[in-house]
Amino acid sequence: MNGLKMLLFSTTLLTAFTLHAQVTLKQQVKITDEGLHFDGRNLDFSNVGTPDTGEKYDFFFGPNISAHGDAVKTYKHYVFMTWYKGGKSERNVMLSRYNTLSGELSTIEFPHRHTGFRGDPLVGESHNTIGLSVSPINGTIHMVFDMHAYDNNNHDGKFKDDFFRYSYSIAGAAELPHSEFTLDKFVKDTSEVSQGENDYKHLTMTGDLSDKGNFARLTYPKFFTTVDGTLLLYMRLGGNNNGAYVFNRYDAETETWSTFTKFNENNQKLKGNPYNWGLYGNMKYVNGKLRVGFQQRSNDNSDKYKYQNGVYYAYSDHPDGFGDWKNHKGEPMTWPLINSDEIKVFEPGDYVSHTDANSVYIVGSFDWTVTEKGDIHIISKVRSTDRSRPDYEEVYIHSYKPAGAEDFIISTDFTGASEIYTSGDNVYIVGLEGGRPYVEKAQGGTNNFVRVYEASDGPTFDHGTLYIKDGKVYYYLMERTSGNAMPLYLQIIDLDLDLESDANAPIVSFPSPSLTVEQGFEKLSLNIAAESPVEVRTIQSVTLYINDELVRTDTSLPYLFGHGSKPHETGAMGWLDTHEPNPSPLPAGRHIFKAVAVDSEGDSSVATMMLTVNSNAPIISFPQESLEVDEGFEKLSLNISAESAVEGRTIESVSLYIDGEFVRTDTSLPYLFGHASKPHETGAMGWLDTHSPNPSPLTSGTYEFTAVAIDSEGEESTATMQLVVKGEPEPPVVTWPNSTVTVYEGYEKLAITIDAESPVEGRDIQSVTLYRNGELVRVDTRPVWNFGHSHAPYEFGAMGWLDRHDPNPAPLSVGTHTFTAVARDSAGLETESDMTLIVLSLPGPSVMINESDISLLTEYQNLSITADASTANDDTSLVSLALYIDDQLVREIYEPPFEWGADGYSNELLELSEGSHLARVVATDSNNKQSESSIFINIDLLGDLNKDSVVDKGDTRLFTAKLRAGETMDIRYDFNGDGVVNNRDTRGLIRRCTYSRCTSN
């Protein structure tokens, strides 16, 4: 019944809200048929080393990389979109610009190609999105792209001097004519770390390479534009359970970016927090402020959360976010943030009943926004980790705080969504259903979502990303087809905000946005204020709802609810002698009061108030909320406190449960469980000589103790306590970034940071000791546990890389070497982990013949062959390149250019006989290592047109036929030397006949 009433109410609101507005699709345009998409297998660490080498494009994390992330923005009447070009062998970064006035589409292809998961182009990575922005002040275009926490050293150094990718244009490029909107309007990198002549990627945004450390280990670029046109960029620093949000600022006047500033610290444990944590959410610039909303992922893998937990929110009153950060209540927070609890809003995990380790899954379907009026809206989802468990739970949550309210309203009456957006004072859910776009809308500060747009035809889409500006949705979508190149579309959906209608809507408010009363409250009279801002309009009605149930409609002033004639309508008991007790008073808990005012023109507005009814139920508590004991504990006595909050009531009983299993009911004070007469009921072994050992003690694990108190009126309350039974001592965990590392002999640098931590709260790592092939290298007693750094360059056998480093007198030789790291914690426990270092001998030189296979006719006059070669490293030099034809040495050259058959040696390749010849160029380096490259030289008999190894009348007939057919002939068939090949040259061909009879004929 409640669901039906909610549906009817929402339909009424839809009619009111759309009286002056109609959400419509204004434009749809295809951007390309070649958007990159990953259509292969979803790999993991067990099979990422063996990706598909054919057409299928395997991936890590997810299949989407085009129309994904911060990929669409507007500037004046242009829409800009970034994408990667498909298919698998292309992968170029692309930028498209759509002119909404002329319909003209311009596209720029950049040289850079998606590098793939950890540098493997055969494995796509969905996190490597392209962030995009255009400065409204100077028309520069900015792109940050294709990175996932890279730095100079990780992933075997594949991203050295290329771990951050930033491209930008000259001023004014955003609105250049179609013919001038070209790649050369972007600025090349000409620094000392440039990747080549066509490198448009910059390692820093400041232009100063000394800042490069500030741009390392970053992921997920997203740009914002402030109210004054300033560009901000935010990214995530670090990893999933130890990260930070960082942001920087663009000065359009000087055309320079600042370095990144942290919103929160990473490595929080080193700064006094009990644990490290990372962020899963967003930083956004919305309603004139920089704000942050996220879920936390800690490195505690033993709690009930599989990954994330909590909802956290903060905002800055500084125009660019550089300070003045506060929680949702307006209270100052530590900046940069260290303890996330300072800004915690609520815990979604409380909305499911599971308590066992890793049983609660809070990933995905999280987003937030803030309306122009200041209403905060946060959506999230919590479910059981194991979808197959019989008590599976799944809850979608919409938590919102109307402007002016003190606390959030937490509603589970929500169908769920992946993203939430705002425009004006409304909030919107925009998504795909059945592959087609839809839009749902609610007034800010409410949970009244109604569908206002739904596409019924057109392409079916796989996914998309969007940007909302000036009341329009710019929905950037990928069509659902097949393969690793799929079409991309732009849809422009007009929300038709009807700002004039919004400005004319009634002004309605409760006396207070929130109120608290005691259960059984006698009186609650609410005088709701409602008036029209338009002089000639009047208020026709004010309707009150409680928890979306219709209470009453009032059509005349004052709009008073809960007055003496209707004492029960606000949930009160009644306060006059003439009032019968309310048979259905509001129970303890939170209740949403909603007032809907309608004016004489049919415009409507909504106001909400949250009423908190404090419970009359018993007050019950354990001595502690949580407790830790060692496995085999002898005694656990729990004196549970229980009393009534209402004078005259008594406690009738207290019952104890462990993980839902009934233990015992106690009906008299003290409510003591686990006492000497019942030592085993709390899971203990027993502690007196008279106690037999418990046959079923609590073993290692986490248990939930629940106490239920019932008072003399039958009302009940519960309290919980978590008991952690610790098993055998847990040693520290030590891990290498890579279990196997491969280098070439003579390698200059190998620096590795080893991760070591204790899984036991309160313990610290005291030391990490490194051994090489069983021999002690060094004991490190201070984090970070870094070996092979610039002050100890030889620890992993490297030669040394700085000018001050003497060459290592004992570098590691070619072969396999074992390095062992031993971590010791403050309890004296140790763990070791091995890494295998494979040292390969240097490869020979690289050599390539520049020509492809060559085909010539006998009596040819010219033939030359060229080659290029390089050595494996700068310390090795090239000795020579030698050309062999059919294994016969032609000539050995000792310095470039490497060319045979030219200059003073023009005859050395002439007079090769008819047939096929193998040409090989052999390169030799200073290590006496060789490599070779080869081609075939095919010499055909001049005049042998039919390829039968003789020149005869068959060839003369074929020659004549080709001339009649107008085919182009080799100029060497111009036997009479008149500059053309025609019938007059037939006699010259006949004279070349192999047999005399052909000549006479």
Curated annotation (Swiss-Prot):
Record site: Neutralizes the sugar carboxylate group at subsite +1: R236
Entry GO MF terms: hydrolase activity, hydrolyzing O-glycosyl compounds; lyase activity; metal ion binding
Family: Belongs to the polysaccharide lyase 24 family.
Record's signal peptide: 1-21
Top EC class, one word: lyase
E.C. designation(s): 4.2.2.-
Binding site for Ca(2+) 2: D300, D303, Y305
InterPro entries associated with the record: Dockerin_1_rpt, Dockerin_dom_sf, Ig-like_fold
Name the UniProt record assigns to this protein: Ulvan lyase, long isoform
Gene Ontology BP terms: polysaccharide catabolic process
Role played: Ulvan lyase involved in ulvan degradation. Ulvan is the main polysaccharide component of the Ulvales (green seaweed) cell wall. It is composed of disaccharide building blocks comprising 3-sulfated rhamnose (Rha3S) linked to D-glucuronic acid (GlcA), L-iduronic acid (IduA), or D-xylose (Xyl). Ulvan lyase catalyzes preferentially the endolytic cleavage of the glycosidic bond between Rha3S and the uronic acid GlcA, but not IduA, producing oligosaccharides that have unsaturated 4-deoxy-L-threo-hex-4-enopyranosiduronic acid (deltaUA) at the non-reducing end.
Gene source species: Pseudoalteromonas sp. (strain PLSV)
Positions contributing to Ca(2+) 1 binding: D189, D199, K201
A Pfam family this chain is assigned to: Dockerin_1
Keyword annotations from UniProtKB, A to Z: Calcium, Lyase, Metal-binding, Signal
Active site: H127 (proton donor/acceptor)
Binding site for substrate: S126, H127, Y280, R297, Y361
